[in-house]
Amino acid sequence: IGAAQGLFLALYTAQSYAAVELLPAQDARFYVYGSALAVVLLIGGLAASFFHLGHPERAWRSATRWRTSWLSREVIVLPALMGAVLVYGLVHWLGWDLGTFGIQTQVPGDLTLIIGAGGALLAFALFLCTGMIYACIKFLQEWATWLTVVNYTLFGGASGFMLATAYSAYASPELVNFYAGWTAII
């Protein structure tokens, strides 16, 4: 799941750089296929998570304790992120921008930048929720620290940007150095 979050963040980062002309603009298909890959990985992670549940038949009730349980919060944020990434890719595929709805701006891909910003917030919220699940376990003293959240965020970001590097080598070679550089930084 972390690699999918990181991949989405990498896609959104490149689009943001392109919006301010720091990178060349990419064809919409680059974002469509990248988003599709991220959604497939998120679905795979969600499916895999059912295998470590003691009683998978009770999974539907896991969101009911969202006020006190980081796991419940994760169960809420993950589908929201999946939806945001799916909509991000779909809007790229359809070629929509705010002009489609009568709002004129000078920024290409303005609607996807707005959707992507919401998705980025959800991706970071999911890193927080996932990290806090383990950081709150007191008997695992090595994990019961705020650094667990930092590690989840950094490993997810680095693996996602590395995946974006591999993807761009195939789909958009001019972005390989950009993604590889960010992978090294993270």
Residue ranges and their predicted role:
Residues I1-A3, A19, R65-W70, I76-I186:
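Long, contiguous internal "core" modules enriched in hydrophobic/ aromatic residues
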Residues I1-L37:
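N-terminal signal-anchor module of multipass membrane proteins
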Residues Q5-Q15, G45-S49, V87-L90:
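Alpha-helical transmembrane segments of multi-pass membrane proteins
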Residues G6, A10, A47, L53-P56, ...:
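Alpha-helical transmembrane segments of polytopic integral membrane proteins
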Residues L23-A84:
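Membrane helical hairpin/interfacial module
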